[in-house]
From Swiss-Prot:
Annotated Gene3D superfamilies: Cyclophilin-like
GO CC annotations, alphabetized: cytoplasm; cytosol; plasma membrane
Annotated compartments: Cytoplasm
High-level lineage: Eukaryota, Viridiplantae, Streptophyta, Embryophyta, Tracheophyta
Enzyme class, first EC level, given as a word: isomerase
Regulation: Binds cyclosporin A (CsA). CsA mediates some of its effects via an inhibitory action on PPIase.
Keywords of this entry: Allergen, Chaperone, Cytoplasm, Isomerase, Rotamase
Keyword Ubl conjugation: no
Protein name, as recorded: Peptidyl-prolyl cis-trans isomerase
Enzyme Commission code(s) on record: 5.2.1.8
SUPFAM superfamilies listed in its UniProt record: Cyclophilin-like
Keyword Isomerase recorded: yes
A single MF term (Gene Ontology): peptidyl-prolyl cis-trans isomerase activity
Length: 172
């Protein structure tokens, strides 16, 4: 079975920025890929937090040029929240895939086995994250959109303009 493909339709500063299409590595990280896929479709309804388990209308709250663009905190919006489809946090599935360069999709965490809904898209090779963050996908279309998001970031991670997932879902 081919790996699922999901999308984010992004806006930057209230203006449409385009679509990011990602392939999820369900073949190597099925649990992590399924969490992200279901958070793209919103099919699991409301989570324990009382918020929808859905990336729609969430923001990229931390963007560091030359490093990564981070999002997925749909409960607090600032990097302190988020929730997985499995309940609060879930274990690191494996570290088979590596942070090999731009477009790698990986789980943000607060230490071992603390995966929720926060993720990041690499904009460079970040090999120091290997063995610490679970790589579960890659951007297959829309790296230009990722680059546009990267442009509004800063060394502190604060964005100059609001970066929002206006819509998201599954393509295949």
């Amino acid at each position: 079975m081919p790996n699922p493909r999901v999308f984010f339709d992004m806006s930057v500063g209230g203006q449409p920025a385009g679509r990011i299409v990602m392939e999820l590595f369900a073949d190597t990280t099925p649990r992590t890929a399924e969490n992200f896929r279901a958070l793209c479709t919103g099919e699991k309804g409301t989570g324990r937090s009382g918020k929808p388990l859905h990336y729609k209308d969430s923001s990229f709250h931390r963007v560091i040029p030359g490093f990564m663009c981070q999002g997925g905190d749909f409960t607090a919006g600032n990097g302190t929240g988020g929730e997985s489809i499995y309940g609060a946090k879930f274990a690191d599935e494996n570290f088979i895939k590596k942070h090999t360069g731009p477009g790698i999709l990986s789980m943000a965490n607060a230490g071992p086995n603390t995966n929720g809904s926060q993720f990041f898209i690499c904009t460079a090779k970040t090999e120091w994250l290997d063995g610490k963050h679970v790589v579960f996908g890659q951007v297959v279309e829309g790296m230009d959109v990722v680059k546009a998001i990267e442009k509004v970031g800063s060394s502190s991670g604060r964005t100059a303009k609001k970066v929002v997932v206006e819509d998201c879902g599954q393509l295949s």
